[in-house]
Amino acid sequence: MSVSGTDVEMVVPAITVRDLCFSWPKGDRVLHNCSLKVPKGEFWMLLGTNGSGKSTLLRLLAELLSPQSGEIDIQGRLGFVFQNPDHQLVMPTVGADVAFGLVEEKLSIAQVRERVEEALAAVNLLDLQRRPIYALSGGQKQRIAIAGAIARHCEVLLLDEPTALLDPDSQLDLVAQVQRLIKNRGLTALWVTHRLDELNYCDGAFLLEKGEVVDRGDPVRLKQRLMQIQEA
């Protein structure tokens, strides 16, 4: 299927996917010749109906799954944020959880403390450093997961429907904060969503149908297209 819409030439992509194919062991095809590019320093969203392959694509990018064919190129250290943050918050307190991701770097205690405080300040949760994880709201848990990626100096963020379990106010607070983080810190992000109001915060979007990118570009245009489909 050919891709419609304006395909802007991206000189420096941070995420490149070329002709990616993936099927489950039983033979169900999920992605077929899927290709996309996310420019460095931009915030893009990935849209599509349930079963279109959005979450599978993110897991392939994060090397949680392996494709049958195709190429993936990611420029920079990668951070992944799950739909349910309880899947990745493993330590009892906020500060300890952010620090846990730094173990492999063999930093000094002072360096770890500096990284943790910098990351929590970036998501406006520095005052919760000693707070138990169980005492956090859903939105705060997602921000802690993002802080973990910032502490590890990740340059590319993959976020799999991070607002799916949040109320509308917390949803928009989170997407607005991620937008600011990306711009202020020069990050690149690909955010899976099915909520059209989140498109107001991104630089561009991809529409995935049956495992293929069928449209890409201006989020306002894509939002209008999807609203027309829903109203039909």
Regions found by a protein language model. Name each.
Residues 157-161:
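Catalytic Walker B motif of ABC-type/P-loop ATPase nucleotide-binding domains
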Residues 62:
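Helix-to-loop junction immediately C-terminal to a conserved catalytic motif
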Residues 132-136, 140:
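Conserved ABC ATPase signature
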Residues 2-17, 21-33, 109:
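A short, flexible loop at the N-terminus of ABC-type nucleotide-binding domains that lies
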Residues 110-128:
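Conserved ABC ATPase "signature" region
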Residues 212-232:
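Conserved beta-strand-loop-alpha-helix hinge in the C-terminal portion
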Residues 47-49:
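The feature captures the beta-strand-to-loop junction immediately N-terminal to the Walker
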